Regions:
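Redox- and metal-dependent alpha/beta enzyme cores, enriched for Fe-S-associated oxidoreductases
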Residues: 155-230, 237-245
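Active-site regions of enzymes building and remodeling cell-envelope glycoconjugates
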Residues: 63-70, 115, 166-168, 230, ...
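The feature marks the mature, well-folded catalytic cores of soluble enzymes
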Residues: 2-180, 189-192
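Short loop/edge segments at beta-strand edges and connector loops
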Residues: 29-31, 121, 234-237, 273-275
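Cofactor-cradling patches in redox/metallo enzymes
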Residues: 7-16, 25, 210-220, 230-249, ...
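Extended, charge-rich low-complexity interaction segments
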Residues: 50-51, 55-63, 141-159, 199-213, ...
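Peripheral docking tails and interdomain loops at the edges
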Residues: 175-179, 184, 257-295
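Beta-strand cores of modular interaction/reader domains in eukaryotic scaffold and signaling proteins
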Residues: 2-4, 53, 205, 231, ...
């Protein structure tokens, strides 16, 4: 069998491999970078009978892959402490797969305080109710609530939820205990500046990912038809050096949406989302801005 895990969990693989060998299995470890269930190492799988992917849930129906989520406990007093900050009696409740097992306890805490939590799902890319990904906010959008609690770490997901839903979002971190309200306006100002900078570009590279869960070829072909200065590029790993070597004045990303939002500072030229390129080409207005998701 082949073992794969994202960067933060890779050091668990040698110990797991040793345990499996003692049980009589032949094991190969995938050492390539991995950023999610959208990034399966099919080459490693094809050298084994099965690929065990640790840390995520499936986003598609790739054969001969077993998914084993990595659950992380946390302190749910953060939910108790957020209650006085709520303005609504009915709130959406979402989390990432790492904390999915904490949702029902959070539900009980909220209900005991007279708050009715709304949890939606499952969906195509998020098989657990209440689960969101950095590229999929269906569980948040379908709550149809004016206020949403995100239980998890970091602000990327809460900002995406705010843009996707227009709801008031409260981010509750069960690890640090912090409660934050994300500022999506700052991100939108940055993205607007990049769109304006890209208007003067004389060439646009439309990136198509070769990764199983990130390939949006049809979308990329549609975007390429919006400008006679656009060319399709197929890539597995999108890195600053690769983009610099290709030499386009601007790139449009149809691979992992987090590349444009999280990693723009690393890239030498604007890296736009599909919706941002539509704004640049006049297909939509900026007030119709949508966060990029893989659906």
């Amino acid at each position: 069998m082949a073992l794969q895990a994202p960067e933060g969990l890779k050091r668990t693989l040698p110990r797991l491999a040793d345990d499996l060998r003692r049980r009589g299995y032949s094991v190969i470890i995938s050492g390539d970078p991995c950023y999610g269930a959208c990034d399966l190492d099919l080459a490693a799988r094809d050298r084994a009978d099965i690929l065990i992917h640790i840390g995520h849930t499936p986003v598609d129906n790739t054969e001969r892959v077993i998914y084993e989520p990595w659950l992380v406990d946390g302190d749910l007093t953060v939910i108790t402490r957020v209650i006085p900050h709520l303005r609504e009696k009915k709130v959406g409740l979402v989390t990432t797969i790492q904390h999915i097992h904490l949702l029902q306890k959070a539900v009980r805490i909220l209900r005991d305080a007279g708050i009715e939590p709304v949890i939606k799902g499952p969906f195509a890319r998020t098989p657990c109710p209440g689960q969101v990904l950095g590229c999929s906010f269906d569980a948040a959008k379908t709550t149809k609530t004016a206020e949403i609690i995100f239980l998890g770490t970091g602000l990327f997901h809460p900002i995406g939820i705010q843009i996707a839903t227009q709801a008031r979002v409260l981010a509750c971190d069960p690890i640090t205990g912090r409660i934050e309200q994300p500022d999506a306006d700052r991100l939108l100002r940055i993205r607007y500046g990049l769109i304006e900078k890209a208007r003067s570009a004389q060439s646009y590279g439309i990136i198509v990912s070769s990764k199983t869960g990130q390939n949006r070829r049809a979308l990329a072909e549609y975007l390429a038809h919006l400008s006679d200065k656009a060319q399709l590029i197929i890539m597995r790993e999108v890195t600053p050096d690769q983009l610099l070597n290709l030499g386009f004045a601007c790139y449009v990303n149809t691979a992992c949406p987090r590349l444009a939002y999280d990693d723009q500072v690393r890239f030498p030229v604007p890296l736009l989302t599909p919706g941002e390129f539509e704004i640049l080409c006049g297909v939509r207005e900026f007030d119709q801005y949508e966060v990029d998701e893989i659906v």
